[in-house]
């Protein structure tokens, strides 16, 4: 009888426990991987994977709490983009939200991630490495921009 109570207690504890949320340590893989896929696609003048990656980012950001809501909202908007122009505009909002989220939470994105800025649109983006690949103008102005901080 004691064992049965122990089993029932253990099961009820597991079932009633709050869902596990994504922690700051998970940010590089859960937010940065889809973000970087979007960046690469837009820099290459393509929409390949943009919608799927934006939806994934929105889902992850929803689990991170109120500070990540701008990331979730921006990613959701990007997921509805119908063309490159709309996607690039939404990506600018998403990039602003990502930078703000990192500042607000003290998160570091690691993995050689740098903040770059396009002087033409005055918008940042996060990218791997220091070789500029501008997602706002793609191949027509691929190297336009500068690294702001590493």
Predicted feature locations:
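Bacterial N-terminal signal peptides that target proteins for export
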Residues: 1-14
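Intrinsically disordered, low-complexity terminal tails/loops enriched in metal-binding residues
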Residues: 16, 20-150
């Amino acid at each position: 009888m004691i064992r049965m109570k122990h089993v029932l207690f253990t099961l009820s504890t597991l079932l009633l426990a709050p869902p596990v949320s994504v922690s700051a340590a998970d940010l590089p893989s859960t937010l940065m991987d889809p973000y970087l896929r979007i960046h690469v696609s837009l820099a290459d003048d393509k929409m390949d994977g943009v919608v799927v990656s934006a939806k994934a980012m929105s889902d992850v950001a929803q689990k991170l709490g109120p500070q990540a809501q701008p990331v979730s909202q921006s990613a959701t908007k990007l997921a509805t983009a119908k063309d490159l122009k709309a996607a690039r505009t939404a990506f600018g909002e998403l990039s602003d939200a990502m930078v703000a989220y990192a500042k607000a939470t003290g998160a570091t994105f690691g993995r050689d991630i740098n903040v770059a800025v396009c002087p033409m649109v005055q918008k940042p983006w996060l990218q791997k490495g220091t070789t500029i690949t501008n997602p706002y103008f793609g191949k027509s102005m691929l190297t336009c921009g500068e690294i702001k901080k590493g």
